[in-house]
Amino acid sequence: MSVKGDIGVIGLAVMGQNLILNMNDHGFKVVAYNRTTSKVDEFLEGAAKGTNIIGAYSLEDLANKLEKPRKVMLMVRAGEVVDHFIDALLPHLEAGDIIIDGGNSNYPDTNRRVAALREKGIRFIGTGVSGGEEGARHGPSIMPGGNEEAWQFVKPVLQAISAKTEQGEPCCDWVGKDGAGHFVKMVHNGIEYGDMQLICEAYQFLKEGVGLSDDELQATFNEWRNTELDSYLIDITADILGYKDADGSRLVDKVLDTAGQKGTGKWTGINALDFGIPLTLITESVFARCVSAFKDQRVAASKLFHKTIGKVEGDKKVWIEAVRKALLASKIISYAQGFMLIREASEHFNWNINYGNTALLWREGCIIRSRFLGNIRDAYEANPDLIFLGSDSYFKGILENAMSDWRKVVAKSIEVGIPMPCMASAITFLDGYTSARLPANLLQAQRDYFGAHTYERTDKPRGEFFHTNWTGRGGNTASTTYDV
């Protein structure tokens, strides 16, 4: 009798193929299936040639070739396609078998699938996988959540193929029940949007404002690799800025300035609004991509308003350091807001997410991997109840040290006409978050004026609510008390 597979993978696009090859490299026997079965043969005769990878030509064939409990990983497009494959798989599975969704599914879908499949005796895991094609092949960041009973069976495979920290720790651990893994992956993607936009704002300020040459820009980002900004996105930015087209000019200058998006940043912003978390920077990064898409409108508007960008005067080195500090401080705010959203969701759904472990999952293998994620892990290990990352002594010190230069950069960008929506929103958030008193007293009075929404008083206990006739005619005031 032939040896059966340890795990099956459905979907032979590049991500699926690379994960399979990664699993094979780590000694796991993988059964590969694709709806278009000719792709199975192409894979077996191509990248998988000479390996122990097994082909399957139907879902029944796939199930028959797997050890029990069967473990089947879906690497297919998120949405209805996932439900289609689940429904098609069910007749060939039995109680205790495991389905893993490794795509970018929206976490409510994962919540639904975990519950529905539990009733059928099938254990479902929704896992975020980050790192792109290279990560999938050589070690991605993996964020599993769902039915915790399944974790012991898939843990050896997923942790083996994941990226590892310098200390050898796997960038894969159990996140929480139901849709916790896909929620954390969604926030990861939102932070990715923010990081990319912040880098672009620094790039434009230095290029068009300060007037750095192409060589100076590349050198600057190369130098930043040796600072707290050290990260995958800084690395690739330095590479991009140095890449020359056939004519010797920088290719990046010929790339059309319209950015695409797949929707996960939008999901993060929508969930922030639903949970009441001020995810200002990430939401602005999504809107920045939306503005970039209005290319024709922007060109017309620039002519209509005679838009020009002013020159940033002063020592280039001084401005480069100021921008570096502003970029780092803004990045801290982005992560702080992201973890605030994760905390709120974890408490709402009772997921019990370990925030330090979440930072570890992102330390290597994924798009947002960076040096200071180790510091984030340290902060949450020192204080698991930390609400605002900027309150940690390490990050508080960076924010305070950067404050003057941060304000200078944002103010100068407004003066010369360079849009910096994310850096500006970051410092504005911090100013608001650290303000003991905000003008919301007037706002709440306005709400009470036109809608009788009531208000609390500073000279009365919290929980006692008042309504006033603000016209001065009648002078009526009502008082009620209820829990808030």
From Swiss-Prot:
InterPro entries xref list: 6-PGluconate_DH-like_C_sf, 6PGD_dom2, 6PGDH_C, 6PGDH_Gnd/GntZ, 6PGDH_NADP-bd, 6PGdom_BS, NAD(P)-bd_dom_sf, Pgluconate_DH
The keyword NADP belongs to this UniProt entry's keyword annotation: yes
EC top class, as a word: oxidoreductase
One Pfam assignment: 6PGD
Binding site for substrate: N104, S130, G131, G132, H188, N189, Y193, K262, R289, R447, H453
GO molecular function: NADP binding; phosphogluconate dehydrogenase (decarboxylating) activity
Record-listed E.C. numbers: 1.1.1.44
Keywords of the record: Gluconate utilization, NADP, Oxidoreductase, Pentose shunt
Family membership: Belongs to the 6-phosphogluconate dehydrogenase family.
Protein name (record): 6-phosphogluconate dehydrogenase, decarboxylating
Source organism per UniProt: Aggregatibacter actinomycetemcomitans (Actinobacillus actinomycetemcomitans)
